[in-house]
Regions:
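Acidic-and-aromatic substrate-binding clefts and catalytic sites of carbohydrate-active enzymes
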Residues: 49-56, 79-100, 123, 127, ...
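A cross-domain feature marking catalytic cores of carbohydrate-active enzymes
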Residues: 19-21, 74-78, 117-121, 177-180, ...
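N-terminal regions that are enriched for targeting/export leaders
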Residues: 1-72
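C-terminal beta-sandwich/jelly-roll accessory domains of carbohydrate-active enzymes
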Residues: 323, 332-411
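Aromatic- and glycine-enriched glycan-recognition loops and surfaces
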Residues: 42-69, 90-109, 154-161
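C-terminal domain-boundary segment and adjacent tail
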Residues: 1, 7, 197-223, 261-352, ...
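Active-site-adjacent pocket scaffolds in enzyme catalytic domains
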Residues: 1-9, 16, 22, 28, ...
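A solvent-exposed, charged loop/short amphipathic helix patch at secondary-structure junctions
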Residues: 26-50, 132-149, 298-302
């Protein structure tokens, strides 16, 4: 018998939506553009964009995503533009208004989206002692695009504080997001970020988001894997650029960039057909646009989600996933060891994930059991789910959630 762990859970290509630059009520990029224009001489339209994104819109957006099954990652910048910490009263809002947004986030966003910081401010690098900018021109994405590798403790503490603020606000993070170019070299960044998240949440397999690949294959890298400890740092890579209004809120909005009306063109069909994770990057500002009647990015997303559903109406080929589901599965797959006999497969699984999916060949199973518990046979891809197996040609697909590190599968 030969056995392999398939690249994706249930052998379905994951779809996922990354939402960047979001935070509690504040339009972070109003302040970003206002404060950055004098430094670099750009003429970004900061006076045209809203200062606040209302809770009502955020709730509507989250409820629509839940109804459509859309999942992904939602940034919450912990100290947006250095205005104040979200686990303390922000100067622009009353405590009731702020707590209402946080409660809405916990109830409506968290069930379907991982929460991550997008580092501390998404603008100035702050002095951790004073919580004031270190220097006017030292920004997280310019200056700390190359992290000070000789100050690993400082970088780890900086990221850990970002995570701690979210946890204090009732939003424990699953990983971290880079603001702009923040976070080189990657191996150093991955090590610091992993230590920071684990310090706050204890998560053995967090992840980071930094890179975007708009052409070619999409990987799901695993950093600093330790089989003995069962720890690793995952990385999610976006497969698209942003055509949902971008970070300004007044950028391009184009559904056809993602998937055309005939369901054949655009970036996403190519990614899906290649079997790669179809991860869309977006920015919260673009979904809302310049005002409540704009919603340019939200309209694009609604069109794209509808087209993706029409392309796979039975859900046999794709499945919406949170980013952390994708990266943790990649960690589990990379760190697993399989030892196959004639009718017995022994798995050593330092990281255990739901819906672990195997392909078996060279054997005709009479039945399939995991640790003595029989799995249910199904006849179609649409019915293939956790706790089942499916004969397909000369192979058998098996999906189950392992309960322990040493797991035995018999056929």
């Amino acid at each position: 018998m030969q056995a392999e762990i398939l690249r994706h859970a249930l052998d379905r290509v994951p779809l996922s939506l990354i939402i960047d630059d979001s935070t509690v009520l504040v339009n972070l990029n109003y302040f970003f553009m206002r404060d950055r224009n004098p430094i670099d001489g750009e003429r970004r339209r900061w006076e045209d964009v809203p200062v606040v994104h209302p809770e009502s819109f955020t709730r509507e957006f989250a409820e629509w995503c839940a109804a459509q099954g859309v999942k992904g990652k939602f940034s919450v910048v912990p100290c947006p533009a250095g205005l104040g910490r979200i686990d303390e009263p922000l100067p622009l809002f009353g405590s009731g208004q702020q707590e209402s947004w946080l409660r809405m986030c916990r109830e409506c966003i968290v069930p379907n989206f991982d929460i991550t910081p997008e580092m501390l401010t998404h603008t100035f690098v702050l002095d951790l002692g004073t919580m004031r900018p270190v220097a006017p021109n030292l920004w997280e994405q310019w200056g700390w695009d190359q992290l000070p590798v000789d100050r690993e403790e400082l970088v780890t503490d900086y990221i850990a504080l970002s995570c701690r603020i979210l946890a204090n606000a009732g939003l424990p993070p699953e990983g971290v997001t880079s603001p702009g170019g923040f976070g080189n070299p990657l191996d150093f960044y991955a090590r610091c970020a992993a230590a920071a998240v684990r310090r706050v949440t204890g998560n053995p397999t967090p992840y980071f988001f930094k890179r975007v690949t708009q052409k070619g294959p999409i990987e799901t890298p695993v950093w600093h894997a330790d089989r003995q400890a069962g720890t690793a740092m995952g990385e999610i890579i976006a497969a698209t650029g942003d055509r949902t209004g971008s970070w300004t809120g007044y950028g391009e909005a184009d559904a056809d960039y993602y998937i055309t009306a005939d369901l054949a063109g655009g970036r996403l069909p190519a990614v899906i057909d290649a079997g790669d994770p179809a991860v869309l990057i977006s920015h919260w500002q673009g979904f809302y646009g310049l005002h409540n009647e704009d919603r340019r990015g939200f309209k694009v997303l609604q069109t794209v989600v509808g087209r993706l559903a029409a392309r796979d109406p039975g859900g046999e080929r794709t499945r919406w996933r949170r980013c952390g589901e994708i990266t943790t599965y990649a960690c589990a797959r990379e760190m697993a060891e399989l030892h196959a006999g004639d009718r017995t497969l022994t798995l050593d699984l330092p990281v255990r994930v739901p819906e672990l999916t195997l392909r078996l060949t060279g054997v005709e199973p009479r039945e399939v059991a995991v640790d003595g518990v029989p799995l249910r046979q199904v006849q179609t891809r649409a019915a293939f789910a956790d706790g089942t197996y499916l004969h397909e040609g000369d192979a058998t697909l098996v999906a189950f959630t392992p309960g322990r590190r040493e797991t035995v599968l018999t056929v």
